[in-house]
């Protein structure tokens, strides 16, 4: 299957550069996955599309302010560090710019010395293993010194860090927000609960590979990055109850979808408490084992994310919906509008 089959024309002006003032002010397109029928709505109306006994599954990961700007201790030369993955204790795999300035043994300082670091290993493609030194709690130091690692297509500065976090974010560890969750407010979650819709949480720490374009010509040749996920015993039991009672399981975002499909795929369609790393790649031809529907944003052309959405609703239906979104000037990508596939 050719990657070009998932291409579409997108005017640059439709790429949302800043979040809306109100989280739930975004628009909502509802796509019937069976017929391809479309309904233009608003996210404030999301509750009306759910029934008592349904279950919504959200990703409670919290984004690390993982961009650090510092200097080399010996020369004062400026460097930028992007935290990718915690290896052990205070050692992290990072991406350094410019990489040539940081060799094994190089010492870096951040925030007037509140945080220092030493390079312990040089990796490929600008990667470096870095060991940090600091007083206090690392994540608190990071919250005060770090900046959000916004996607490359967002050029504007983010005034409020919390607008790149969901209102239910809890488990620190993501390099990017699970953006479908950004539309939810506490009020909408309460309304859903009052209607008898279950709200459950999983954790998947989003890696920067989520922004990596599919470089292969053929879909099947693309290798997905691995991301850490976790599901508790309580959540697994709740989802199995919903399934048994005939309720619909609707995932919020591609991250929740990949977590649920990984777990159900490994346990004959059942949900069970588990944690690990997933590199599941979902594209047309995949048979879903966990979800009945999905809330997601509008994705990049030829991305693994639009392929996942196409696996659920059909490529023709999705591309038709995207053409409609362009005509109606929906906002695209991380800070853009939402789609409900049901």
UniProtKB/Swiss-Prot annotation:
Instruction: Supply the EC number(s).
Output: 2.4.99.17
Gene3D superfamilies per the UniProt record, alphabetical: QueA-like
| Catalytic activity, as annotated | 7-aminomethyl-7-carbaguanosine(34) in tRNA + S-adenosyl-L-methionine = epoxyqueuosine(34) in tRNA + adenine + L-methionine + 2 H(+)
Keywords of this entry: Cytoplasm, Queuosine biosynthesis, S-adenosyl-L-methionine, Transferase
Tell me the enzyme class: transferase
Q: Which GO terms describe its molecular function?
A: S-adenosylmethionine:tRNA ribosyltransferase-isomerase activity
The record's annotation in Pfam families points to: Queuosine_synth (PF02547)
Q: Where in the cell is it found?
A: Cytoplasm
GO BP terms in the entry: queuosine biosynthetic process; tRNA wobble guanine modification
Instruction: Please give the family membership noted in the entry.
Output: Belongs to the QueA family.
How does the record describe its quaternary structure?
A: Monomer.
Name of this protein: S-adenosylmethionine:tRNA ribosyltransferase-isomerase
From what organism does this protein derive?
A: Bacillus velezensis (strain DSM 23117 / BGSC 10A6 / LMG 26770 / FZB42) (Bacillus amyloliquefaciens subsp. plantarum)
